[in-house]
Each structure stands twice: as C-alpha cells, then as structure tokens.
C-alpha cells in the first residue's frame, strides 16, 4: 500500500511538471499561476503544495530532470567514433534540429527558455539551463580538434571562436523558428541549415569514406556532403 501511494505521488508530481511546461510555454512563466497549473494537471491547488512550495520550484524541477539534447538523440545517430568526425558532427546537429522540430515537449521547453521567461534569483539561471540541456562545449571542441588532427579542417581554425559562432548560429535559428514556426520547415531544412553553418569551416580534405552514412532515403554520401561544404565556402559550383 505504501509503495502504491508513493508511485501515485510521483505520478501526480510528474503530471504537475508536464502541465507546467504546457502552461509556461503558452502563457509565459510570469503570467502562469499555480491555479493554472493545477487546472491543467486536473488536480487541486493543495496537491501542488504537497509537492512544491512555489512556482519557481516547479520551474527548477522541470530543468533538473531534463536530459541533455545530445543524450536524447544518441540512439538516433548512425555514425560511430571511427567515422569522419566532421560528418558525425553534421549528423548530430541535423538530428538535434529535427528533434526540436518534431517533438512538441522539446519545442515547448525551448519556447520557455527563449521567449517565455524572465529569470529571477530563485530560478535556475539561463546559463545553467543552456549548459545542462545543450551540446557540451568540451565534446564539440574535441570533435573540432579531431578534425584538425586528421587534416579535415584547417589547423588555423580558432576552435574557441568557432564554438561561439556555432552557438550563435543555432540559437538564432531556433529562436527565429520558435517565434514563427510557419516561416520555414525546420525539420526539412535542417540538413541545408547545418551545411551552411559548417561551410564556415575551411575544409581541406574530402572524406574518402563513402560508407559513413547508411543508404536510407534522404542520406547523402560523405563525399557529396564534404564537397557541398567546400563549394558553399568557396562559391565554386558543385559538380
């Protein structure tokens, strides 16, 4: 009996968190009341206070349980550590954008982060949330350094500056799409968007591994992908 009550309590807590995500994304954090959350979760306001002391505590609980995007998409990736690191990075970026476009919960979370929240001192900071849910800078840095060591991109690339550029590009794309998701199809255009971003890197070698990507519909060979990036950078035609 005690175990059942504990499970029911945990279920109610999660109901409140999911309801809060929906309400925050729609109304904004500041405009959402505890009553709004209780009504959306179909529980009493008293049930909220059994689990949370304030709206800020619910907000913090949302992000504390959120997995990093890199972990969420891990099982969807086809390339391994032995494959071309630039193409692996490309696949991760594309899959991440497509996940955001396809999953309403992920979309709602980012809507809250980018457009529906004014942070206060009792809330997890925007910086901490970004660090918690995004791609790890050390992982991206390692991927770029591997590309340099394997002569895929120029050794003159400033890795730290490139990370700043990547963050700016992806934040801008996601923010603009969230403001008006009818303005472009993020899911369909994710490959072209990522290729345009990676085209800022001076690629100096075309990967010889034509088998890096599987033959599923929509996949492009590594040679064609790398050639596309080089052509986008130089302005030369892609023949």
Can you name each region flagged by the protein language model?
Residues 88, 101-130, 209, 213-214:
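Amphipathic alpha-helical segments used for helix-helix packing
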Residues 1-27, 31-43, 56-57:
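Basic, helix-initiating cap at the start of DNA-binding domains
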Residues 99-102, 115, 119, 142, ...:
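Amphipathic C-terminal alpha-helical segment
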Residues 1-11, 207-239:
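N-terminal intrinsically disordered/low-complexity leader segments
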Residues 71, 75-76, 83, 87, ...:
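Amphipathic alpha-helical packing segments from all-alpha helical-bundle domains
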Residues 61, 75-106, 159-166, 206-207, ...:
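Hydrophobic alpha-helical connector segments
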Residues 24, 33-34, 45, 55, ...:
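Amphipathic alpha-helical segments enriched in hydrophobic/aromatic and basic residues
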